Each structure stands twice: as C-alpha cells, then as structure tokens.
Regions:
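ATP/NTP-dependent adenylation/nucleotidyl-transfer catalytic domains that generate, transfer
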Residues: 4-24, 38-41, 46-49, 56, ...
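Conserved G/P- and acidic residue-centered "switch" motifs that form tight phosphate/ATP-binding loops
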Residues: 29
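Short, surface-exposed alpha-helical segments at coil->helix boundaries
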Residues: 33-36, 61-65
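Alpha-helix N-cap/helix-start motif
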Residues: 60-61, 145
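Active-site glycine-rich loop that binds ribose-phosphate moieties when present
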Residues: 116-119
C-alpha cells in the first residue's frame, strides 16, 4: 500500500503546474478527505485549497472544518444555496403556464444535479483566483462504475487521483495515511434526502467492489442485475462527448 501511496503522490505532482495549487471541495466525506491528504503530501499544505460549499445549511459541515484543520490547509466557504434557488426559480418561471410540467423546485433531476454542477462551477471560479491552479476530481471507481455522480458536476475536474480505485482500496489508503477513523469510515450520504449512498443505490459498496473485482459468487443475483443495469444506463457520463466526424460526409 505504501508503494501505491508513493506513486499517487508522485503522479499528483505532475498534474499541478509549478506555482499552482490544487483546489478541491471538502465535503467531510472519505473521498475528499483522502484526496486532500494525498495532495498535501504531494504539494505541501500551502498549495492545497479547500472549498466548503453548503447548500443553505449543511448538517455535517463541522467535519469539513475538521478536515481543513487536520491537514492545515487554507479554505474558502461559498454557500451555494441562494444561487441554486435563484436558478431553479428562473427555470420554473419559464414553465408556469405549462400544465404538463411539475415545478422545477420539485424536479428530482434538478434537485439532485443542479447543486453538484453549481459546486463544480464554484471550484473553477475559486481556482481562477489562484494562477496555474487545477481542480481535483474526487470521484472513485466504484461510484463511477454505476454512474453515481453528476455529469459536469462532481464527475468533472482536471485530474482524478482516486478515479481508478475502488471504495475498498480508498479506505485502505485512508487508514494507511493515518487519517481519523471516523472520517475515513464515515457513512457516505448525498446530504439531501437523509438516505445513505447505499440506500440510494440499493446495494452495498462491498457488493459493488466484489462485482468490480470479479468476485461474482459473493454478489446476490438481484444486486448483480442492478449493477449491470446501472452501468449500462450511465456509461454516457464517462465517455467523451459524441462528435460528428467529417468523414461521415462521404458515406
């Protein structure tokens, strides 16, 4: 594991230009905590900037503060609540007289994905304040496999240190880094509906990681089917945007 950590640290150093900083959202969850810790090892705490982005009130924001304090990194707090509400309201206004549409405020796709996209926009705005800086993607391979992220939201970024690692592997890294157990093993949730990520997915990360690792005998049939279905339905999130190619003119 130490070899992997050393390689991650070396790789991160190649992703941020000299004099630049790594900018990442600090949610207080395992992924952002571990990604931030790796960036600190690679670049020094003075070159890592945390951004706390509550949507109105964030119940566990104290964990975000603890991460920044633990790592000794500078941070900014940008509350996205008013922006999310204002944009949703503007969209809603365009559909007030269209009876076939529900209110934008009640649209689950908007409620789930808009805050994630506003957060990524915020990260790039903060990064723009620091010359030559890069935004860190904090998604992991397990969530990516079943599309448990927002396209152009938390799925975006300039480089992804955890993107090829499963949750199981990331937890091992967090423990090896000596990070507090309650941060590394904190039950992940979306912070909106009160449910855990595993509740939303309908299976555990243990089962998902067993599937990804090819240990199919450990995965119940119904869970196997859910994972396959989600993977097929969300592949568009991780493929390059389809582009019309001029050679088709000659078909």
């Amino acid at each position: 594991m130490q070899n992997r950590i050393d390689n991650l640290v070396k790789w991160i150093r190649t992703q941020v230009p000299e004099g630049g900083k790594a900018v990442l959202g600090i949610s207080g969850g395992k992924d952002s905590t571990i990604a931030a810790a790796l960036c600190v090892r690679a670049l020094g705490k003075e070159n890592v900037i945390g951004v706390l982005m509550p949507d109105g009130i964030q119940a566990d924001i104290d964990d975000s503060f603890r991460v920044c304090s633990l790592l000794g990194i500078d941070y900014h707090i940008v509350n996205i609540g008013n922006v999310c509400y204002a944009l949703t309201q503007e969209v809603d206004t365009n559909f007030l007289n269209r009876w076939e549409f529900k209110s934008a405020h009640d649209n689950p796709m908007i409620k789930t994905n808009l805050p994630a996209r506003i957060r990524m926009t915020t990260l790039y705005a903060v990064a723009a304040m620091y010359p030559n800086s890069r935004v860190v993607n904090t998604c992991n391979a397990s969530e990516d496999y079943v599309g448990y992220s927002t396209k152009y939201g938390d799925a975006a970024g300039d480089f992804s240190p955890l993107g090829d690692l499963t949750v199981r592997e990331i937890l091992t890294i967090g423990d090896a880094l000596g990070l507090p157990h309650y941060l590394v093993h904190k039950t992940p949730s979306d912070g909106m509906c009160g449910k855990t990520d595993e509740d939303n997915l309908g299976f555990t990360y243990e089962q998902l990681d067993d599937f990804i690792e090819g240990q199919y005998d450990k995965v119940p049939d119904d869970v196997f089917a859910k994972i396959v279905t989600l993977h097929k339905a969300t592949r568009h999130k991780y493929r390059p945007i389809p582009t019309y190619e001029r050679w088709r003119d000659n078909i």
